[in-house]
């Protein structure tokens, strides 16, 4: 969903109210704008409003999304704030923090997990059973585990609801042994069974959409960073070490 046209409409709606107030008085009106936005966005339950590194701007975290709003309530800014002195993408750091906060509230039981004997890093993979590079990643699952990388799979059928890939994901996540079923599905083998009403495929897919994921595999690191595409085991380990 494209949230920013909606934000612009909301700001136009409230502009006659917020433009006449001082910074402190504007907080209530800014909250009204953001509360309305929460009702529109899927998977968004709350927001945080903080002073940004730029004077006169609030930083707003809505899930993993980051926007900026002027303290007088007149201006909405979408984009990246770069700290040139320290070579840091301030906005992406805030996004990463938001992703981690969202993931902390997610039950691991909804995922399919491959765990090493000793975990040094944890990654969450948004995967599509019919994606070629997702299958390539899974073919090497033991190599990732040998490097101490815990792999948590979430379902993200790229073709969307009511498609063959979506149905395959439902069969896998509804099976008695999800890992075995996923192994079979990733090998192109048929997985039969019943589709359970409480399967997490839709909620996983919606979360991926909130994170603006469009391709698979997408790797979410334990620092909240997104890596789009396949990485071989050693390359992924190197990226994870660099983040630390």
Regions found by a protein language model. Name each.
Residues 97-123:
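Glycine-rich adenosyl-nucleotide cofactor-binding module
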Residues 4-6, 13-101:
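N-terminal targeting signals for export/organelle localization
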Residues 114-135, 150-153:
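Short active-site neighborhood of thiol/selenol oxidoreductases, capturing the structured segment around
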Residues 42, 136, 142, 146-149, ...:
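Sec-exported extracytoplasmic/periplasmic mature domains
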Residues 119-122, 147-152, 178-181, 216:
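Loop/turn elements at helix/coil->beta-strand transitions in domains of secreted/extracellular proteins
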Residues 46-47, 57-61, 65-87, 162-237:
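Thiol/selenol-based redox catalytic cores and closely related redox-interacting motifs
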Residues 155-157:
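Residue-level recognition of beta-strand->loop/alpha-helix junctions
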């Amino acid at each position: 969903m494209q949230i920013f046209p909606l934000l612009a409409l909301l700001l136009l709606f409230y502009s006659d109210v917020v433009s006449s107030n001082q910074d402190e008085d504007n907080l209530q009106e800014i909250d009204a704008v953001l509360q309305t936005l929460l009702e529109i966005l899927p998977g968004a339950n709350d927001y945080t409003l903080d002073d940004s590194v730029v004077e006169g701007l609030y930083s707003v975290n809505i899930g993993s999304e980051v926007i900026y709003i002027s303290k007088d309530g007149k201006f909405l800014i979408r984009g990246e704030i770069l700290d040139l002195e320290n070579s840091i993408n301030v906005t992406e750091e805030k996004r990463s923090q938001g992703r981690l906060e969202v993931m902390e509230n997610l039950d691991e039981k909804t995922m399919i997990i491959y765990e090493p004997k000793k975990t040094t890093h944890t990654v969450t993979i948004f995967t599509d059973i019919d994606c070629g590079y997702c299958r390539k990643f899974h073919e090497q699952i033991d190599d990732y585990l040998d490097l101490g990388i815990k792999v948590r799979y979430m379902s993200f059928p790229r073709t969307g609801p009511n498609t063959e890939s979506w149905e395959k994901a439902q069969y896998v996540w509804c099976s008695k042994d999800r890992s075995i079923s996923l192994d079979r599905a990733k090998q192109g083998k048929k997985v039969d069974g019943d589709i359970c009403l409480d399967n997490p495929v839709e909620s996983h897919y919606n979360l991926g959409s909130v994170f603006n994921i469009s391709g698979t595999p997408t790797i979410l690191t334990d620092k909240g960073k997104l890596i789009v595409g396949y990485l071989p085991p050693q390359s992924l380990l190197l990226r994870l070490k660099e983040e630390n």
